[in-house]
Amino acid sequence: MELFQTADWKKEKHVPVIEVLRAEGGVVEVKVSVGKEIPHPNTTEHHIAWIELVFQPEGSKFPYVVGRAEFAAHGASVDGPNTSGVYTDPVAVFAFKAEKSGKLTAFSYCNIHGLWMGEATLSLE
């Protein structure tokens, strides 16, 4: 059994998608989302709980945790499941500085289907 599941994000709604929004002058902005091509359910019973982004610069032995976003609104209220009308979309933007290109890895957690992973290359100009 694999700890992290992976797949083509265009065919699987659980895979975190990494988009580099900006990578210039050492300033990096990265958007991570789940359900870009196929929307992931966001209900009290089935939702993405969090996304985490790590970065491993070229030549570095270990990756660095850039950040983590937790999603707490999944429709629950004092009136019961799926009654609040408030739902968080599993999308986060991370901003950081980097001196080298490297590998970006995002993790996401679905409360029903477990841990998922997506990867991308960060190329600095």
UniProtKB/Swiss-Prot annotation:
User: So where does Fe cation get bound?
Assistant: 12, 14, 40, 46, 110, 113
Q: Which domain of life is it from?
A: Archaea
Q: Cofactors per UniProt?
A: Fe cation
**Which EC numbers characterise this protein's activity in its record?**
1.15.1.2
Catalysed reactions, as listed in the record: reduced [rubredoxin] + superoxide + 2 H(+) = oxidized [rubredoxin] + H2O2
Keyword Transport tagged? yes
Q: Which CDD domains match?
A: SORL_classII
Q: What is a GO molecular function of this protein?
A: superoxide reductase activity
One Pfam family, short name please? Desulfoferrodox
The alphabetized UniProt keywords are: Electron transport, Iron, Metal-binding, Oxidoreductase, Transport
- Keyword Iron present in the record's keywords: the answer is yes
Family affiliation: Belongs to the desulfoferrodoxin family.
- What PANTHER family does the record tag this protein with? SUPEROXIDE REDUCTASE-RELATED
Entry function: Uses electrons from reduced NADP, by way of rubredoxin and an oxidoreductase, to catalyze the reduction of superoxide to hydrogen peroxide.
| Protein known as | Putative superoxide reductase
The protein's organism comes out as Archaeoglobus fulgidus (strain ATCC 49558 / DSM 4304 / JCM 9628 / NBRC 100126 / VC-16)
What is the phylogenetic placement of the source species in the record? Archaea, Methanobacteriati, Methanobacteriota, Archaeoglobi, Archaeoglobales
